[in-house]
Amino acid sequence: MYDGLKGFRDFYPGEQSARREVTDAIEDAASRYGFREIATPALERTEMYVDKSGEEIVEELYAFEDKGGRGVSMTPELTPTVARMVVAKGQELSKPIKWMSTRPFWRYEQVQQGRFREFYQTNIDVFGSSAPEADAEVLAVAADALTDLGLTNDDFEFRVSHRDILGGLVRALAADPDAVDTKAAIRAVDKRAKVDDGEYLGLLSDAGLDRATAQEFDDLISDVETVDDLDAVAEAGGEDVEAAVENLRNVLAAADDFGAGAFCEVSLTTARGLDYYTGVVFECFDSTGEVSRSVFGGGRYDDLIESFGGQPTPAVGVAPGHAPLSLLCQRAGVWPDEELTTDYYVLSVGDTRSEATALARDLRALGDDVVVEQDVSGRSFGAQLGYADSINAETVVVVGERDLENGEYTVKDMASGDETTVPVEEFPPEGGEELPTYEDYE
């Protein structure tokens, strides 16, 4: 007997059906805004992540050398891949480029609530627009997907920040701005809620801030709770921070217009840990705090395409983690029903396989979503009826030799146990808009 690997999950039909419903809600929301689906490979060159993603990702790579001696990794995230794709065909693509993709990713990290080593995300990205409306649009897609699932603003919140505010503040407060590693300081902010205060301030010190300045910096960013609170930050940070504050205000104003503003709050302690992020960043959390992991995350990465050798191309994206999203939906009581149902079970008795199969085909032709099963194991009448009950068949149609001699089928309602006979030529009826059931013939 072989056990599954730690952090790698199996999904049985009921759970997978619910997961598919959630994925469909996200993709449908993105499709309504004009995002087009792409597909991407499971393997990329390891050097791409070493160069572009940052040390945290690199430490978690499933990396190996292939038979050609190339260093390759199972994809831990999608953004570098889509950046590579944009560079490859950038001149042929109309901008803004709006793509989405749902697929698994792999990171060797500590398994815990909402975190696995194989995990699923739906990435939603816009390339070619630096306007605040692009940031607002991806926020709106995320908000629409969540509300389509039945969640409300009592269930989730987007914490919106700006990395140029954080980096600008660090440089403005530092005794020697040139000695400060702003990316390291921003990574420290990203870890703020995950480590104790002493370790957090130590990380800021390692980035080039003395202890007192690190505390001053943290006091400034943690005091911001509303848009109006940004005034003090702009005053402390100088021109660069003022420009970033103005950009953040514009994004939040656009989010209001897109209908996502009610779900957004300013949170400068949100940073996003990946080095390629540039401007506005955001994370979505369970408002109650019961689900600790972020449900959606995203932001701007305006420099990434150029770093791949392409033309300067602003970009912004968002992605939900399907595992923490499922926890949020379950906590809020909106996780889809995992109980599967079957519209019809065609039960054959005696030598009626051809007739039963023809009827099953006719029933499947009634609609794309109609589920029809029939016996493929040569089982007895009782065994077939028991199986029909186990798959939650709503209607059983008995095709027996004696029934056919009389030119009829027996139609059975599984919920009540009631049944009736129906002339063969009347089941299924021609031109009916609803699926025929026992109640139509009782």
Swiss-Prot record:
One Gene Ontology CC term in the entry: cytoplasm
Residue ranges, compositional bias (Acidic residues): 427-442
GO MF annotation list: ATP binding; histidine-tRNA ligase activity
Coiled-coil stretches: none
Compartments where found: Cytoplasm
EC number per UniProt: 6.1.1.21
Annotated catalysed reactions: tRNA(His) + L-histidine + ATP = L-histidyl-tRNA(His) + AMP + diphosphate + H(+)
GO biological process entries: histidyl-tRNA aminoacylation
Keywords assigned: Aminoacyl-tRNA synthetase, ATP-binding, Cytoplasm, Ligase, Nucleotide-binding, Protein biosynthesis
Superkingdom: Archaea
Keyword hit for Ligase: yes
Region described as Disordered: spans on this chain: 416-442
Gene3D superfamilies assigned: Anticodon-binding domain, Bira Bifunctional Protein, Domain 2
InterPro entries: aa-tRNA-synth_II, aa-tRNA-synth_II/BPL/LPL, Anticodon-bd, Anticodon-bd_dom_sf, His-tRNA-ligase, HisRS-like_core, HisRS/HisZ
The keyword Ribosomal protein belongs to this UniProt entry's keyword annotation: no
Pfam families assigned to the protein according to its UniProt record, in alphabetical order: HGTP_anticodon, tRNA-synt_His
Record family assignment: Belongs to the class-II aminoacyl-tRNA synthetase family.
Database matches in NCBIfam families: hisS
Protein name (record): Histidine--tRNA ligase
Gene: hisS
